[in-house]
UniProtKB/Swiss-Prot annotation:
It catalyses: (6R)-5,10-methylene-5,6,7,8-tetrahydrofolate + NADP(+) = (6R)-5,10-methenyltetrahydrofolate + NADPH; (6R)-5,10-methenyltetrahydrofolate + H2O = (6R)-10-formyltetrahydrofolate + H(+). This is Bifunctional protein FolD. One of its GO terms (biological process) is tetrahydrofolate interconversion. The gene is folD. Its EC number is 1.5.1.5, 3.5.4.9. GO terms for molecular function: methenyltetrahydrofolate cyclohydrolase activity; methylenetetrahydrofolate dehydrogenase (NADP+) activity. It comes from Pyrobaculum aerophilum (strain ATCC 51768 / DSM 7523 / JCM 9630 / CIP 104966 / NBRC 100827 / IM2). NADP(+) binds at G174, K175, G176. The keyword Oxidoreductase applies. Belongs to the tetrahydrofolate dehydrogenase/cyclohydrolase family. Keywords: Amino-acid biosynthesis, Histidine biosynthesis, Hydrolase, Methionine biosynthesis, Multifunctional enzyme, NADP, One-carbon metabolism, Oxidoreductase, Purine biosynthesis.
Amino acid sequence: MVTWIRGEELHARTKEWARSHVKRLEEVGITPKLAVLLLNDDPVELETQRRFVTLKARDVREIGGEVEIYELYSAPPERRTKEALRLIESLNRRDDVTGVIIQKPLPPFVDEKALFSALSPEKDVDALTPENKKRLLTDFDLDRDVLPCTPAGILELFKLYGIDVRGKDVVVVGKGELVGKPLAVMLMQLDATVTVLHALSKEREPYVKRADIVISAVGRPPELYKDNPWRLTGDMIKEGAVVVGVGGKVDPATKRWFFDVDEKSVAEKASYLTPNIGGVGLATRARVLKNLIRTTYQVAQRVLSPRLYEV
């Protein structure tokens, strides 16, 4: 029988932890404030990102923080990078803004490298600036470092459920900058044997079939994409595999979610499985809160005193 890897406990516990730190920070006049930039005007991406941002914003407000959402997706394509850079420079200078998320994926015409290079690493909640990416190449501290939210959330779920990745054959399907790439690097740092599959990989199924752990982070459900669609089904995995589903998109016409993993068939063979609703999404949201508290302390140490440490 499958064991469901649920995110509710991690999410609730992190919210309580974050509330306690918000109270401590408020005693010295600092309130966590998250700024989120939305730049992608693709209908599917925009609808999906709006859902995610709404949930993140609710979490931040529930712990006592503040949120500012900047909708830049209506700017003309030729001006969108420039307007985003101007806003990022302003947010970097504002001491009341303690964390920034540039919501990914970005449209192809936006200069992603320029945006993340411009963002202050001190306020980088998603850990995607060049300086913060380097942290993954050395030993990282899952509890204390600002790390990519979804990969760190997945590793926290593994820790909570006692899933050891050392020496395991792990397949990561998807090589995106937000999940696939950083997660693969983090898993290698934890001594897993990692294979990364993507749209150009030949014969993906044999790799998936022999994997001890399969992490699907594609986000191209067949219902919404005719070009390179992806869905993980039960016949593709071995008996007893651990399966983590990350990818999901919202149909802007019906408002329905569609996911990477066929939950019903995979549950018949997997030993552990994240539910499409209430699994990795909650773990990611928990990590957003944890990272925001970390970046807020970094801002507070610069503005007030380097002696203001977390406890």
